[in-house]
């Protein structure tokens, strides 16, 4: 076997290396000193480092949540007490017992969808027995007496 050839291209030429070092010294790149930071405060706060937003290995919500309150669950039944009848006649207002979780906007939307009527405003209260009562005031172009007849209250 013949002796292994020595690769001369990998080793840098000493003359070229010296010229490169001399050029660096002349330009001042090799010996630039970093200015020392003067600390004026006694306490040292560690600098903030990069915090990447964490992403989980799997989604925490498996499925989209379904709407637990639909229009039929919001309005339970209309009240037919004597005071409720007086509200229908005098104030153009219908009185409903509604789900405890329903808010005024949901009640308004449910009345609009189920009975095709526009509401002016909705007042709610929670009764001592734990149920929610809603006073639904109708707009002047709807008559509460006619709507009550259509629903079957009267």
UniProtKB/Swiss-Prot annotation:
GO cellular component: cytosolic large ribosomal subunit; cytosolic ribosome; Golgi apparatus; nucleolus; plant-type cell wall; plasmodesma
BP GO annotations: response to cold; response to high light intensity; response to oxidative stress; translation
Superkingdom of origin: Eukaryota
Gene3D superfamilies xref list: 3.30.70.330
Record keywords: Ribonucleoprotein, Ribosomal protein, RNA-binding, rRNA-binding
SUPFAM superfamilies assigned: Ribosomal proteins S24e, L23 and L15e (SSF54189)
UniProt family annotation: Belongs to the universal ribosomal protein uL23 family.
Role noted for this protein: Binds to a specific region on the 26S rRNA.
Protein name listed in UniProt: Large ribosomal subunit protein uL23z
Taxonomic source organism: Arabidopsis thaliana
Gene assigned in the entry: RPL23AA
């Amino acid at each position: 076997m013949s002796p292994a050839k020595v690769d001369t291209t990998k080793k840098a030429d000493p003359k070229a290396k010296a010229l490169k070092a001399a050029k660096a010294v002349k330009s001042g790149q090799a010996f630039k000193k970093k200015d020392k930071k003067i600390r004026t405060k006694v306490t040292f706060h560690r600098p903030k480092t990069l915090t990447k937003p964490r992403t989980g290995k799997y989604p925490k919500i498996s499925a989209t949540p379904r709407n637990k309150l639909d229009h039929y669950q919001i309005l339970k039944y209309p009240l037919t007490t004597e005071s409720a009848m007086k509200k229908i006649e005098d104030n153009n207002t219908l009185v409903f017992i509604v789900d405890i979780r329903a808010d005024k906007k949901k009640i308004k939307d449910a009345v609009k969808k189920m009975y095709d009527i526009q509401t002016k405003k909705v007042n709610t209260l929670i009764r001592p027995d734990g149920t929610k009562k809603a006073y639904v005031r109708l707009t002047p172009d709807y008559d509460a007496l006619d709507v009550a007849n259509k629903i079957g209250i009267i």
